[in-house]
Curated annotation (Swiss-Prot):
It comes from the Eukaryota. Its main location: endoplasmic reticulum. Residues 203-213 are cytoplasmic. This is Endoplasmic reticulum vesicle protein 25. It is a single-pass type I membrane protein.
Length: 213
């Protein structure tokens, strides 16, 4: 089957995702973090571009971490002003979070809002294919095929990660169900034992009162 260039570009557009958001970040003396989560495969390049306009008495801090069991913290940057471009490489397949806090350092009303623009490029989206094309003299079709190959690889890795996570959750559910079954059996045994003890106690009581032989 022949795949034409427009069809290839359309398919690539469907597979790629753009993680760009603009939101207001409220300052506080003890600010609560705002976290943007995106999935990233192991050993993936993650580029975070943050545009933070400079405002007096406000300090915006950025931290890049993941939601794995280890809780890896890849980068921390204090007092970000203007445009900041941060790049990290993930250690394992997990959700990667960009954590932002806006700390108020002045003496007046701490509830001040700052508008923040955040762009997160992961894996194939973070690679500069124009530079690769110039370096290796690739045609447009070859560049798009290279992009499509990288995106397909990421999809396969993400599906594998979801499958492994589903297996872990299933094992946890089975283990929990087994413990519940054992606990239920113990409860039933204790209930039966208590009932037998009460019957014996009542029988002994009635004998002492000469109500039964």
């Amino acid at each position: 089957m022949i795949l034409r260039i427009p069809s290839l570009l359309y398919l690539f557009t469907l597979l790629t995702a753009v993680y760009a958001v603009k939101f207001d970040l409220t300052s506080d003396r003890n600010p609560k973090p705002s976290i943007i989560w995106n999935f990233a495969s192991a050993h993936s390049l993650v580029i975070v571009t943050a545009n933070v306009p400079g405002e007096p008495d406000q300090q915006v801090d950025i931290q890049i971490l993941d939601g794995s069991e280890r809780g890896n913290v890849y980068l921390s940057k204090k007092d970000v002003r203007g445009e900041a471009r941060l790049a990290v490489t993930t250690h394992e397949s997990a959700d990667v979070g960009v954590c932002l806090t806006n700390r108020y350092t002045g003496s007046g009303n701490p509830r001040v809002v700052r508008s923040v623009e955040l762009d997160v490029d992961i894996g194939a989206d973070a690679i500069d294919y124009n530079a690769i094309a110039n370096q290796e003299s690739l045609s447009i079709l070859e560049v798009e095929m290279r992009k499509l190959e990288a995106v397909t690889k990421e999809i396969v890795e993400e599906m594998g990660y979801l499958q492994r996570r589903e297996m872990r959750m299933r094992d946890t559910n089975e283990s929990t169900n087994q413990r519940v079954k054992v606990f239920s059996v113990l409860i039933i045994c204790c209930t039966i034992g208590l009932g037998v003890w009460q019957l014996l106690h009542l029988r002994s009581f009635f004998k002492r009162k000469y109500l039964i032989d």
